[in-house]
Regions:
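Glycan-recognition and catalytic cores of secretory/periplasmic carbohydrate-active enzymes
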Residues: 1-128
Length: 128
């Protein structure tokens, strides 16, 4: 459950909660995200689309609960993700922490970025 592919649905539950508040709508999101935040790990977001999937969950849950830990951990996870995927020279993100240059190269030996993933990273900032 501590994986963006499973957590992305929490965005919808948070949105539904704002339409008609009912603690049951966000109970599982709160349980999972607060458990995740209680661990010492900061490497949950190691792939570009994970940022799109979970960053908005963190901001939405902060808005609904007022718990500042959501924003603190968002910053911690974002810092980790940037450290392994962001190429400051190009201003772009690699697909994930395993596809970084020079470990992974394009067929012509150059840096290999993933346009869709970079789009998701930018969209993540717009979803909250």
């Amino acid at each position: 459950v501590l994986f963006g592919d499973y957590q992305i649905c929490f965005q919808t539950y948070a949105d539904l909660y704002t339409v008609k508040p009912d603690s049951g709508k966000i109970a599982r999101a709160r349980e999972v995200m607060e458990y995740q935040m209680s661990t010492d790990k900061d490497d949950y977001w190691w792939w570009a689309d994970g940022l799109y999937m979970v960053m908005p969950v963190m901001t939405k849950m902060y808005k609904l609960t007022g718990n500042p830990l959501y924003l603190e951990k968002l910053h911690e996870y974002w810092t980790y993700a940037n450290s392994i995927m962001y190429d400051a020279e190009e201003g772009l993100y690699y697909r994930d922490g395993k596809y970084i240059y020079p470990k992974h190269k394009s067929v012509n030996g150059k840096k290999d970025f993933w346009a869709r993933g970079d789009g998701w990273v930018l969209a993540a900032w717009q979803r909250y």
